[in-house]
């Protein structure tokens, strides 16, 4: 039975990760660290312990103090340029907190790190967002977890709480394409709940050492891998 920790639990993918973790018979305890109380905590959950604070400088110490030590640390944490007030602030928040929390998990003795990244992530990208995501990935790989799992979904289909008009339009198109034929959608967009289940399944498999050959240290899942693992 695994004990896990999660940041990003109130986002579109993260909320589904939390739901999947709470329902999974192989997960004994779930600790979330967030700015807002996750929706799943509105009802009593025997497995769930939440830490809620707007002061993100407290998050790493909270993670370090968890008992038992989480076997798996999940991050689907992110923000937007608009919410952060510009890309420079977005970088400080998203890159800074992801790296800080991953380091705290590693130092505490966590074995598996599962990061929800993005398709096109590359430290060499000319696109600032993709470069940021790539830099987070590279720092995660260098931390030396027993297993690092990186998911690179395309467009994420689902309902967000915050307004992102262009993304909403693309999600509408993805939804229509999926109704015509799933293959028209799966190559470039994945449902949030499918991504979440893939993250949970991959994390638990990695904990057991059940990873593809050649991916013993770092396992990267693209769109087709996410679809396959998320529908198991």
From Swiss-Prot:
PANTHER family per UniProt: OXIDOREDUCTASE HTATIP2 (PTHR14097:SF7)
Superkingdom, taxonomy of origin: Eukaryota
Protein name, entry field: Protein fmp52-1, mitochondrial
Record Pfam families: Epimerase
Transit peptide (first-last residue): 1-36
GO cellular component, one term: mitochondrial outer membrane
Keywords (A to Z) from UniProt: Membrane, Mitochondrion, Mitochondrion outer membrane, Transit peptide
Similarity annotation: Belongs to the FMP52 family.
InterPro entries, A to Z: Epimerase_deHydtase, NAD(P)-bd_dom_sf
Organism in which the protein naturally occurs: Aspergillus terreus (strain NIH 2624 / FGSC A1156)
The keyword Plastid is annotated on this UniProt entry: no
Coarse class of the protein's main subcellular location: mitochondrion
Compartment(s) where it occurs, according to its Swiss-Prot or TrEMBL record: Mitochondrion outer membrane
Membrane topology of this protein: Peripheral membrane protein
A biological-process GO annotation: import into nucleus
Database matches in SUPFAM superfamilies: NAD(P)-binding Rossmann-fold domains
């Amino acid at each position: 039975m695994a004990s896990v920790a999660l940041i990003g639990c109130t986002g579109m993918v993260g909320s589904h990760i939390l739901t999947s973790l709470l329902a999974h018979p192989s997960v004994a305890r779930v600790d979330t660290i967030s700015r807002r109380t996750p929706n799943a905590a509105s009802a009593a959950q025997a497995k769930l312990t939440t830490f809620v604070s707007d002061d993100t400088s407290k998050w790493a110490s909270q993670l370090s103090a968890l008992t038992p030590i989480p076997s798996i640390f999940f991050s689907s944490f992110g923000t937007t340029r608009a919410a952060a007030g510009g890309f420079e602030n977005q970088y400080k928040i998203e890159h800074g907190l992801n790296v800080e929390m991953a380091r705290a998990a590693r130092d505490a003795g966590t074995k598996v790190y599962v990061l929800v990244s993005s398709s096109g992530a590359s430290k060499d990208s000319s696109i600032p967002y993709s470069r940021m995501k790539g830099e987070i990935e590279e720092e995660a790989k260098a931390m030396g977890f027993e297993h690092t799992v990186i998911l690179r979904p395309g467009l994420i289909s689902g309902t967000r709480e915050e307004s992102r008009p262009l993304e909403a339009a693309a999600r509408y198109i993805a939804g229509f394409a999926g109704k015509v034929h799933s293959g028209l959608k799966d190559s470039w967009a994945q449902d949030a709940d499918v991504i979440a289940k893939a993250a949970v399944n991959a994390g638990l498999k990695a904990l057991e050492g059940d990873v593809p050959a050649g991916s013993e240290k770092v396992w990267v899942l693209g769109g087709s891998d996410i679809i396959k693992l998320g529908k198991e």
